Structures are given as C-alpha cells and as structure tokens.
UniProtKB/Swiss-Prot annotation:
<feature type="binding site" description="axial binding residue">
    <location>
        <position position="654"/>
    </location>
    <ligand>
        <name>chlorophyll a B1</name>
    </ligand>
</feature>
<dbReference type="InterPro" id="IPR006244">
    <property type="entry name" value="PSI_PsaB"/>
</dbReference>
<comment type="function">
    <text>PsaA and PsaB bind P700, the primary electron donor of photosystem I (PSI), as well as the electron acceptors A0, A1 and FX. PSI is a plastocyanin-ferredoxin oxidoreductase, converting photonic excitation into a charge separation, which transfers an electron from the donor P700 chlorophyll pair to the spectroscopically characterized acceptors A0, A1, FX, FA and FB in turn. Oxidized P700 is reduced on the lumenal side of the thylakoid membrane by plastocyanin.</text>
</comment>
<keyword id="KW-0793">Thylakoid</keyword>
<feature type="transmembrane region" description="Helical; Name=IV">
    <location>
        <begin position="273"/>
        <end position="291"/>
    </location>
</feature>
<keyword id="KW-0411">Iron-sulfur</keyword>
<dbReference type="GO" id="GO:0009535">
    <property type="term" value="C:chloroplast thylakoid membrane"/>
</dbReference>
<comment type="similarity">
    <text>Belongs to the PsaA/PsaB family.</text>
</comment>
<dbReference type="GO" id="GO:0000287">
    <property type="term" value="F:magnesium ion binding"/>
</dbReference>
<dbReference type="GO" id="GO:0009055">
    <property type="term" value="F:electron transfer activity"/>
</dbReference>
<feature type="transmembrane region" description="Helical; Name=IX">
    <location>
        <begin position="575"/>
        <end position="596"/>
    </location>
</feature>
<dbReference type="GO" id="GO:0009522">
    <property type="term" value="C:photosystem I"/>
</dbReference>
<feature type="transmembrane region" description="Helical; Name=X">
    <location>
        <begin position="643"/>
        <end position="665"/>
    </location>
</feature>
<keyword id="KW-0004">4Fe-4S</keyword>
<feature type="transmembrane region" description="Helical; Name=VII">
    <location>
        <begin position="417"/>
        <end position="439"/>
    </location>
</feature>
<keyword id="KW-0603">Photosystem I</keyword>
<feature type="binding site">
    <location>
        <position position="671"/>
    </location>
    <ligand>
        <name>phylloquinone</name>
    </ligand>
</feature>
C-alpha cells in the first residue's frame, strides 16, 4: 500500500480513522517523536527551518514596502505627517457599492484604501526614506535577501553542508557569533546608517549611494575620532526650533546625550539614538570576545556554571551540572529564549508609547494604541510558550542523576512551597482587589460616592518623584532642586529629561491615583495567577503525589482511566491550556487600562478615567459601552461609514469567540454520537452515499477539542478587541 500522510509516523499512517489526519497535523513539528529521528537529523532540520523562518520575515517586510510604494501615499504623507492619513494598501472588493467606495476612499487616494496603523510610515520617514523609489529599492533588496535565505536553508540540508552535532553544541562559538557578529556588528551598522543617512536627511541633506562616500556626516569628519576629542561629536545639537527634515534650526552633532523629545516630532532625538546604538555595539562586540574558542583564552561556560555554588554549603550545589543539562536540551534552550523574548516584547510595548522613537508617532494615537496592544498580546503568547517548553524539558530531557542537589533539583524539591506561596499571593490580590472594587460599586449604586475606599499609590508616586516628576511635591532626588543628581542633570547628562517628564503632552510617567492603584493590583492578580498555573504545570510535569509516574504519560494526556480516579486535567499541557485563558484575561485588563487612560489623556478629560475607574460599573459603562458606540454605528439607518469594516469585525470576533465554547463545554462522547448518527444518515441517503470516506470519521480527542476551543476563544477575543480599539480610537481622532 502506498504510504499515506503522515510520512513521519508509520503507526499513525496506518490508523483507519480520521485520527490519522488530526494527530498527523498535531505532531508534524514535534520532530523528536518522528520515526527514525536521530539527534543529528533533529538539529539539522531545526537549523534549516530557521532559514525558512527568516526568509518568510524578509518576504513579509518586502511586501509591506512594496505595497506602500505601489498603492500608498508615502511621499504625500512625508509633506504633512500630522494631517495626511497613511495608506497601507488599496482595497479591491467587488461587493462594494457606491457608499462603501466613498467611505473607504481617503488619504488622498483615488479609490478605496486601508489606513496604516502599524507605524511603518513613521519608521521609514525617521530612518531617512523619502520617496517611493526608496521604498521599492528596499523591497527589492529584501526580496533578494529572502531568496538568499531560502537557498541557505536548502544548502544546509545537503550532505556536504550539514553541520555536525558538535558544532550545534559549541556554546562558546555560538555566544561569540551571536554577541559580536549579530548584535554587535548589526548595531554598529545601524549606527552607521543613522549617522550617514538618517541624521543628514532629518537636516534636509539628501544622502544616497551616489554621494554616500563624499557627504561628510560631521563637518570635522574623522578628525576628532583619531584625536581622541570625541566630545566634539556631541557639540552643537539640533535646536528646539528644529523643523524635522529641513536645515532650519539644525545642528551638526551626531552622537548626543540630550534626553527628552524633539519638540516638533515628539520623538527621541535621532542623535541620542545613534549614540545609544553605538554604545550597544561597543558593549556587544567586546562581549563577543569573552568566551574561549580557538586560542585557549577567555571564559568557558561550563567552568563558570560549575563554579557557581552558594557559599556556606546549605543551599546545595548551585549550578553544577547545568551546562550539560541546558546544552543537551533543545526545550530548555527554547524555554530560555522565549522567556527572554517575551520580556523584551512587553518592554517594547511599554517603551514605544512612553519614549516614542519614530518621528510623529506620538501624534498618531490609533497607531500608538495598536502597537501597544499588539506587542502585549504577542508577549503573552511567547511567555506562556516559555513555560510550556520548560515543562516539556522536565518530562523529556531532565536527568535527576546529572542534576543532584543543584538549582533545578532544588526547585523540584521545594515545589510545594513555591506553588503554595504563589497561590497565597493570588488569593490575597484577588480577594482584596475585588473587595475594593465591589465596595466602591455598591457605594455608587447607593448614591454615596464619598464612601468609596480610595487609596493613593504613594510608593509609586514617590518613585515617579525620585525620577524627577515634580507634581506630587515629594521634593526627593531628581525632583529636588538641591540634589547633586538634579544639578548634574542640568548640563552633564540628559538635560531634556526633566522637561519631558514634567510635560503633560506625552506619556512619560503618567500621573496616577486611586483608579491606577486598583487596576495595578488587578493586573498583579492576573500575572500571579497565570504564573501560578504555568509554574505548577512545569514543576508537577514529572509527577505529583496524586500521580507519581506522570512523566511516563508524556506532555499531554487526557486522563488515566477510571482505575486511579481524578487524573484528568493534570497533564502539563492542561496547565498551559488553562494559563492561556488567564494570560488573555490579564492582557485584556492591561490593554483596557492603557487605552482608557490614554484616550482620556488625548481628549483632555483625564477626570473621566480618574473618577470612573475606581469601580467596576465605571469600567463597563464609561470605557467599554461608551467607546463601542462609534463601532456599532458603522452601519446605521443613514447608511454606512469607514468604521463599518470594524463593526463587521467586532461581530465576527464575537462569533468566533463564542464558537470556542462549543468545543470547550461539550465533551467527546456527544460529538462521537453525533458523528455516528450523521455517518448513518449519509450511508442511507441516495446520491450522497456514492461519496465514501477512506478514514472512519471519529470525534476529536479531548485534548484536541480543547486546543480547537482555545484557538477560537483566543482568535475571537483578539479580533473583538482589535476592532473595538481601532474603531473607538480612529473614530475620535481620525
């Protein structure tokens, strides 16, 4: 018999039911579990797939550039960034009637278009691109790079070019290559681009390939560099009256330490950012020369880890055995990488709005909201993935013999204390926060708002004051005119910082009060509960008192039959599954908070947030209900407008979300019976029964149905909020 899908599993390919297809898809990327898989082939397949991933990323960015150059209004937007709406791409839709065509024809376009809320216009403008020709050039270049990576991926699967396992496990060489080669040199190259192209362009000087080698980025060229007078490069920065993109008010400095924002663009100074990238480059290039490879000098990772034992002997053997454990476990490495990337992505969300790096981004409110929300959701998914792979590590790769009494073993030994402390923190936060919200709700319902319990976040306000925010009157550190830090800041470093932090037109260190105090603790509840579920899932993945042999069952199992009773819902996968709901819940609160605080800030009615955010009805009525009105009016008795697409998406998102419950709340037997009844009917229906199936139809497994339910819940949840966010923000601010 010809081999059927999946080729990687002989057992599955012979399964006579539709389980073959579903389990085949589910395990397609679990290379470790495939037939005849060796360690060497595993590493090589993953390595080659990285090139495919990079090719897709470059193709995608190339597509962004291409569509904006072809169908966008980049040049017109550059002439007036505050009033022209940036176009992402044209819409060709045969269903559009005349009202729709008119509603979606905007941004100076001749036909229906989508508006860009991704911030790419601001980014490309900041880094010195000005014409459609520039965009096409970038697009073609990235297309070429994409093809190059596809070829590289194919090449590294050929016998002559396949790296050996020892090459993959050479930690020091990889560190050197990633630190110096990737981070260091790319940061240096980016500094070069900023200094040679972006900064001159921001001062009205057009540098392209034809004059790159003749246009001096600084009047004195490399003279000060070789003379050791580096401070010359910081002298004569752009003035506060500088008009971005022109020579009016422009200076000559290329590497500065001004702090604060460019008054016109409301973004960080380009010369500050060039300085930052140069510093990063220097640090990382040095860091990439620290590890021992060919010359027998430098650090050995194994020696560093073996040496890390706590003094006194009472805290175990520290990091002994960790090197081999990490170096031989791809899941451990992936878990660490995802945890780092998740934190970085969330930091990007926080910094994109508080310290906007791109010109005019701060004035494009819808883009600000979209970027914040996007990065927080991505961070949530990446972080939960980190714990999932941590749990898989404990099941598949952890060796108790190699890790006797080291930090990993001690985590497992202390798991009851860790889990119960997290549980206690979650309970404390949940009961107290909800108690305060509900108390305040009742007081408002009974017409006695003055009896609310309103707690000022004094510690957070003190921290803001220490960083220079004068509003609260704490008079401490940077907010005290007598402190040495304050005096040094006037001249030596970041003189623009104090102006920025005390300026109400940006989002740096927003003024906070009782509403912020409450929602902060609600978010803390969400974070601690999500962490509790994920940490418990990983620490109990190998076994628990209830099920000591859990690791023999693998990462995901539904139950172990009636014999042991009560072993359902305790696989590591189930913990991950439950945690995703809590993660989405938490990010919902985070994004609601951010968005509501900012729309009141942008509209100049911060009192609305301050007064309504202290009780639950305020959130439901004055944030969700009030801001969904434009959305629901995408269609109305008078026709339609440009928000109609978001009205559709809002409805569709609710539909997808609700569909998730069909999979989550009913169990497998119901579907199996239904399928058998439908199959019976099919076989007895004329004409229909001419169509037969090769695989006997069976219901999804419990775990698979949960995955399908979770996917619908997540996608619907995100679609619904995305439509709400973009429509409510763009409906107010255009």
């Amino acid at each position: 018999m010809a081999s059927r899908f999946p080729k990687f599993s002989r057992g599955l390919s012979q399964d006579p039911t539709t389980r073959r297809i579903w389990f085949g898809i589910a395990t397609a990327h679990d290379f470790e579990s495939h037939d005849d898989m060796t360690e060497e082939r595993l590493y090589q397949k993953i390595f080659a797939s990285h090139f495919g991933q990079l090719a897709i990323i470059f193709l995608w960015t190339s597509g962004n550039l291409f569509h904006v150059a072809w169908q966008g209004n980049f040049e017109a937007w550059g002439q007036d960034p505050l009033h022209v709406r940036p176009i992402a791409h044209a819409i060709w839709d045969p269903h559009f009637g005349q009202p729709a065509v008119e509603a979606f024809t905007r941004g100076g376009a001749s036909g229906p278009v989508n508006i860009a809320y991704s911030g790419v216009y601001q980014w490309w403008y900041t880094i010195g691109l000005r014409t459609n020709q520039d965009l096409y050039g970038g697009s073609i270049f990235l297309l070429f790079v994409s093809a190059l990576f596809l070829i590289a991926g194919w090449l590294h699967l050929q016998p002559k070019w396949k790296p050996s396992v020892s090459w993959f496990k050479n930690a020091e060489s990889r560190l050197n290559h990633h630190l110096s080669g990737l981070f260091g040199v790319s940061s240096l190259a980016w500094t070069g681009h900023l200094v040679h192209v972006a900064i001159p362009e921001s001062r009205g000087e057009h540098v392209r390939w034809n004059n790159l080698l003749t246009a001096l980025p600084h009047p004195q060229g490399l003279g000060p560099f070789f003379a050791g007078q580096w401070n010359v490069y910081a002298q004569n920065p752009d003035s506060n009256s500088h008009l971005f993109g022109t020579s009016e008010g422009a200076g000559t400095a290329i590497l500065t330490f001004l702090g604060g924002f460019h008054p016109q663009t409301q973004s960080l100074w380009l010369t500050d950012m060039a300085h930052h990238h140069l510093a990063i480059a220097v640090i990382f290039i040095i860091a990439g020369h620290m590890y021992r490879t060919n010359f027998g000098i430098g650090h050995s990772m194994k020696e560093i880890l073996e040496a890390h034992t706590p003094p006194g002997g009472r805290l175990g053997r520290g990091h002994k055995g960790l090197y081999d454990t990490i170096n031989n476990s791809l899941h451990f490495q992936l878990g660490l990488a995802l945890a780092s990337l998740g934190v970085i992505t969330s930091l990007v969300a926080q910094h994109m709005y508080s310290l906007p790096p791109y010109a005019f981004l701060a004035q494009d409110f819808t883009t600000q909201a979209a970027l914040y929300t996007h990065h927080q959701y991505i961070a949530g998914f990446i972080m939960t993935g980190a714990f999932a792979h941590g749990a898989i590590f404990f099941i598949r790769d952890y060796n108790p013999e190699q890790n006797k009494d080291n930090v990993l073993a001690r985590m497992l030994e202390h798991k009851e204390a860790i889990i119960s402390h997290l549980s206690w923190a979650s309970l404390f936060l949940g009961f107290h926060t909800l108690g305060l919200y509900v108390h305040n709700d009742v007081m408002l319902a009974f017409g006695t708002p003055e009896k609310q319990i309103l707690i000022e976040p004094v510690f957070a306000q003190w921290i803001q004051s220490a960083h220079g925010k004068a509003l609260y009157g704490f008079d401490v550190l940077l907010s005290s005119a007598d402190s040495p830090a304050f005096n040094a800041g006037q001249t030596l470093w970041l003189p623009g910082w104090l102006d920025a932090i005390n300026n109400n037109s940006n989002s740096l260190f927003l003024t906070i009060g009782p509403g912020d105090f409450l929602v902060h603790h609600a978010i803390a509840l969400g974070l601690h509960t999500t962490t509790l579920i994920l940490v418990k899932g990983a620490l109990d993945a190998r076994g628990s008192k209830l099920m000591p042999d859990k690791k023999e069952f693998g990462y995901s199992f539904p139950c172990d039959g009636p014999g042991r009773g009560g072993t359902c819902d305790i696989s590591a996968w189930d913990a991950f599954y439950l945690a995703v709901f809590w993660m989405l819940n938490t990010i919902g609160w985070v994004t609601f908070y951010w968005h509501w605080k900012h729309i009141t800030l942008w509209q100049g009615n911060v009192a609305q947030f301050n007064e309504s955010s202290t009780y639950l009805m305020g959130w439901l009525r004055d944030y969700l209900w009030l801001n969904s009105s434009q959305l629901i009016n995408g269609y109305n008795p008078f026709g339609m407008n440009s928000l109609s697409v978001w009205a559709w998406m809002f409805l569709f998102g609710h539909l997808v979300w609700a569909t998730g419950f069909m999979f989550l709340i009913s169990w497998r037997g119901y579907w199996q019976e239904l399928i058998e009844t439908l199959a019976w009917a099919h076989e007895r229906t004329p004409l229909a029964n001419l169509v037969r199936w090769k695989d006997k139809p069976v219901a999804l497994s419990i775990v698979q149905a949960r995955l399908v339910g979770l996917a619908h819940f997540s996608v619907g949840y995100i679609f619904t909020y995305a439509a709400f966010l973009i429509a409510s923000t763009s409906g107010k601010f255009g």
